[in-house]
Amino acid sequence: MSRIGKKPVDLPAGVSASVSGQTIEIKGPKGTRAFKATDDVTLTVEDNVVTVTPRGKSKRARQQWGMSRTMVANLVTGVSEGFKKELEIQGVGYRAAMTGNTLKLNLGLSHDVDYTPPAGVTVTAPKQTEIVVEGIDEQLVGQVAANIRQWRKPEPYKGKGIRYKGEFVFRKEGKKK
């Protein structure tokens, strides 16, 4: 029995949901998102509450039950509040700046890195050492933040690089003479 799947998903004010077949569409103030569930679960909407129930007792149905409920909850959070990932840059001469829709990163490489985010995600640089990634799709926001971080991961000796805000970087001691 899935403890996560048993919980119903409440729809906040201003958010509506409609089910057609195995697809649920959630509309909110920040946009519209849809999710197609597998045939192992049933989606129902009653009184601003979305419930997910398994269609059988197979292991796959129980796995999809909790996963589908979490996906629906993420859709509701995305269209009502949105998702946000914050990155910080540490290192001498490491900078970020926005030029139009393109993020320009100066990371000590022989060239500047230009990154254009995909549709549905907004990237801003409030300071030269901060990057904010926002959007309604949690997976896409996380992937864009990971792609930006990939250009210069934090190194363990001085801690230079791009890291998530609040991320702990394991530090190593240098060679001893």
Curated annotation (Swiss-Prot):
InterPro entries: Ribosomal_uL6-like, Ribosomal_uL6-like_a/b-dom_sf, Ribosomal_uL6_a/b-dom, Ribosomal_uL6_bac-type, Ribosomal_uL6_CS. Coiled coil: none annotated. It comes from Roseobacter denitrificans (strain ATCC 33942 / OCh 114) (Erythrobacter sp. (strain OCh 114)). This is Large ribosomal subunit protein uL6. One of its GO terms (biological process) is cytoplasmic translation. NCBIfam families: L6_bact. Keywords: Ribonucleoprotein, Ribosomal protein, RNA-binding, rRNA-binding. The gene is rplF. PROSITE patterns: RIBOSOMAL_L6_1. GO terms for molecular function: rRNA binding; structural constituent of ribosome. Part of the 50S ribosomal subunit. GO terms for cellular component: cytosolic large ribosomal subunit.
